[in-house]
């Protein structure tokens, strides 16, 4: 039974059509970047081409040439089990198929420029390898997703440690709100926000991150090697 649930959970990501990010969903993180605390979820989209699956040989987070400040953001990812549209908050958890540990890699100087100009966050959030993600943890294996410890280290230095209990908007609220705006499909991923402690990584460094007691991942960071010459 457990093996079947695990196999079904892994298949969800293959069906994913989009990644929905939630910004500033932890008060301390909003404040550390000098941002106001939102009164409703702040959403942005990432393409599934930004996924970087943990455990794949040779997989590494790539720092594109123009990026000078690539930041790590550790997050709980929620993976949808079925199509969801206009879902009431009371039944929102029925649409969850599993969870994962994810990183929302962010080109911070691109984000700062976009915010100043009132532009979308595509350049800073959507590039290849900018959504490293673990295997999917079946919903049945997570007793309380609103009380999970997230952590992240860079070269064994602890950078981030926080609890999903500190999220401003909890999972049922996020699913209900997002599904009132856009239809969520089976396998779609919601990145629920990051606790404080975000910071830069450089080529040659190693990121380790996890959900305590459930999963941990490890990714090398390298400079992107383009497949064409100019």
Swiss-Prot record:
Q: Reaction catalysed by this chain?
A: oxaloacetate = enol-oxaloacetate
SUPFAM superfamilies to which the protein is assigned, alphabetical:
FAH
How is this protein named in the record? Oxaloacetate tautomerase FAHD1, mitochondrial
Cellular component (GO) terms are: mitochondrion
Q: What does this protein do?
A: Tautomerase that converts enol-oxaloacetate, a strong inhibitor of succinate dehydrogenase, to the physiological keto form of oxaloacetate.
Alphabetic keyword roster: Isomerase, Magnesium, Metal-binding, Mitochondrion, Transit peptide
Q: Identify one Pfam family in the record.
A: FAA_hydrolase
Member of which family?
Belongs to the FAH family.
GO molecular function terms attached to this record: acetylpyruvate hydrolase activity; acylpyruvate hydrolase activity; metal ion binding; oxaloacetate tautomerase activity
Transit peptide range per the UniProt entry: 1-26
Judged by the first EC level, this protein's enzyme class is isomerase
- Taken from the UniProt record, the cysteine pairs bridged by disulfide bonds within this chain are none
Note describing how the cofactor binds: Requires a divalent metal cation for activity.
Which cofactors must be present for this protein to function? Mg(2+); Mn(2+)
Among InterPro entries, the record links this protein to: Fumarylacetoacetase-like_C, Fumarylacetoacetase_C_sf
**Major localisation:** mitochondrion
**Where, by residue number, does Mg(2+) bind?**
73, 75, 104
Q: Where in the cell is it found?
A: Mitochondrion
* Enzyme Commission number: 5.3.2.2
């Amino acid at each position: 039974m457990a093996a079947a649930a695990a196999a079904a959970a892994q298949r969800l990501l293959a069906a994913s059509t989009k990644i929905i990010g939630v910004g500033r969903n932890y008060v301390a993180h909003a404040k550390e970047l000098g941002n106001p605390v939102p009164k409703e979820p702040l959403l942005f989209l990432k393409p599934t081409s930004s996924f970087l699956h943990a455990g794949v040989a040779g997989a590494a987070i790539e720092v594109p040439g123009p990026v000078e400040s690539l930041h790590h953001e550790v997050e709980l990812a929620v993976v949808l089990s079925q199509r969801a549209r206009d879902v009431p908050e009371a039944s929102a958890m029925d649409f969850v198929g599993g969870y994962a540990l994810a990183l929302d890699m962010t080109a911070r100087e691109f984000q700062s420029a976009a915010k100043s100009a009132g532009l979308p966050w595509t350049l800073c959030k959507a590039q290849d390898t900018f959504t490293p993600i673990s295997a999917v943890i079946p919903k049945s294996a997570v007793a309380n997703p609103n009380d999970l410890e997230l952590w992240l280290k860079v070269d064994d230095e602890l950078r981030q440690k926080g609890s999903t209990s500190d999220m401003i908007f909890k999972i049922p609220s996020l699913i209900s709100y997002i599904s009132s705006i856009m239809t969520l499909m089976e396998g779609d991923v919601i990145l629920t926000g990051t606790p404080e402690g975000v910071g830069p990584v450089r080529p040659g460094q190693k990121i380790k991150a996890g959900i305590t007691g459930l999963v941990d991942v490890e990714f090398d960071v390298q400079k992107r090697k383009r497949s064409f010459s100019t």
